[in-house]
Amino acid sequence: MSKFIFVTGGVVSSVGKGITVASLGNILKSRGLSVSVQKLDPYLNVDPGTMSPYQHGEVFVTQDGAETDLDLGSYERFIDIELTADSTVTSGQVYSEVINKERRGDYLGGTIQVVPHVTQEIKARIQRLADRSKADVVIVEVGGTVGDIEGQPFLEAIRQMRNDTGRDNVLYIHVTLLPYIQSTQELKTKPTQHSVNELRRIGIQPDIIVCRADYPISEGIRDKISLFCDVERKAVIFMPTVSTIYEVPLKLESEGVGDLLVSRLHLNASPSDLSVWRGLVEKIKEPTPTVRIALVGKYVELKDAYYSVRESLCHAAIHNGRDIQIDWVHAEDIEKNGPEEYLKHVQGIIIPGGFGIRGIEGMISAVKYARENGIPYLGLCLGMQVMVIEFARYVLGSDKAHSTEFEPDSPYPVIDLLPEQRGVDSKGGTMRLGNYPCVIQPGTMAGQAYGNNLINERHRHRFEFNNDYRDTLSKAGMLFSGLSPDGKLVEICEVTGHPFMMGSQFHPEFLSRPNRPHPLFREFINAAKKVIRDGEQPSLPLSP
């Protein structure tokens, strides 16, 4: 039978619940326990797939094609597991299912209420993940902040779980912020006290309180929170801001969190072994040369829109013995001012996924700059598509080349709608989503990167390379090095004669891990670190 850890947040949103949950999973896995994770999002959207990146940030895709919150990406990276659609629950999903059941007559004419019907549906989804994953521990993050109207049914559901499954099988953790008052130069505990009081009013007494702060926390604060929040002193955990998020599991373990979880839930666990993770953090903190990469996108004002891309670049830089500097370049700025101003100092250019015509010409200009100047380039999803468009326009001379996403009547549609997408009007959950196999051509850059002829990668797209132009582009120097097993879909393309110019229709950023960077990112950074740009001087050997 699975044990459950429920994690709530207080005082403010974005306090670090997601990284805390991911770190708890990391700690438990280091003790030989199997872990699964679930995110409960109280918003009424069915999933974030149709939400603006400016409102939600990145949409993370699971192996089975669920469009989910970016926190699931953190869970996968920290715990090194692959999650499924069972790991994401929204109010939209819950209420839709309850209403559908009522329409079918499943409730036998009863009056449908938040309690018990909505809460029962939430609990059923939590239990379903436990049953299917068979994990020793299921960690459940409740999105939002205690006190939010939307979150009340979820808090009531997790309150009931302790009675349903037994007191020894459920643990509550509350993550809260200790704000710092500059004028008095002190951290304040009162917001935490009020947040815990709100939880207790609902019927949940936290077993552990994780206190986030940007400043050192005194032992007197630990005593105060323990007294006023009715939590054991050793269960008041200090989590200061650290230089890298990958240090959080080590900090929590040093505070005794792992031992608390094992003892409170009566887990049959091995001694903790975070030696590999500790080595990773030490490597991150080592002073190393910097590689400078331009990320050209259309949502760069909100960096969380490219969260997995940013982390994947970091993973690859660590592997290559480099720090990473990312220049966040808005594609529309390139349209206005040209690429030289923004790209002349960078050692590599990456263009991630996106939707819509805004900024497309700026992206195409960035691709052209990379190709003509021998700058390593990696295009992801849309980034591959604009790479194809640029090649068709400026190598083949077909200046009308475009994607039918942006120009439906293009006379040279090198990118077109997938055949199965024709006639699909609904936007939610209807793209080509999840893991699909890809056959790699040996002897190519992709073949050298993967070292394997068959791979599986995650997708999220409606448009694809138009095979009517495959022969034409191949003869001009574009190599299609990755195809679907039936050979019908182009998954990877390369430009021959270039140091590193590659595009993938899939999203490799979803499979990168801190200790195991994705092959495409790894080789991209490996190529970029060799580039010397304006104003840079290579290191000279010291005289004997």
From Swiss-Prot:
EC nos: 6.3.4.2
UniProt pathway: Pyrimidine metabolism; CTP biosynthesis via de novo pathway; CTP from UDP: step 2/2
Recorded GO CC terms: cytosol
Catalytic reaction annotation: UTP + L-glutamine + ATP + H2O = CTP + L-glutamate + ADP + phosphate + 2 H(+); L-glutamine + H2O = L-glutamate + NH4(+); UTP + NH4(+) + ATP = CTP + ADP + phosphate + 2 H(+)
Enzyme type, top EC level: ligase
Residue numbers binding CTP: 13, 148-150, 188-193, 224
Record InterPro entries: Class_I_gatase-like, CTP_synthase, CTP_synthase_N, GATASE, GATase1_CTP_Synthase, P-loop_NTPase
GO biological process: 'de novo' CTP biosynthetic process; pyrimidine nucleobase biosynthetic process
Additional detail: CTPSs have evolved a hybrid strategy for distinguishing between UTP and CTP. The overlapping regions of the product feedback inhibitory and substrate sites recognize a common feature in both compounds, the triphosphate moiety. To differentiate isosteric substrate and product pyrimidine rings, an additional pocket far from the expected kinase/ligase catalytic site, specifically recognizes the cytosine and ribose portions of the product inhibitor.
Task of the protein: Catalyzes the ATP-dependent amination of UTP to CTP with either L-glutamine or ammonia as the source of nitrogen. Regulates intracellular CTP levels through interactions with the four ribonucleotide triphosphates.
Name listed for the protein in its UniProt record: CTP synthase
Gene: pyrG
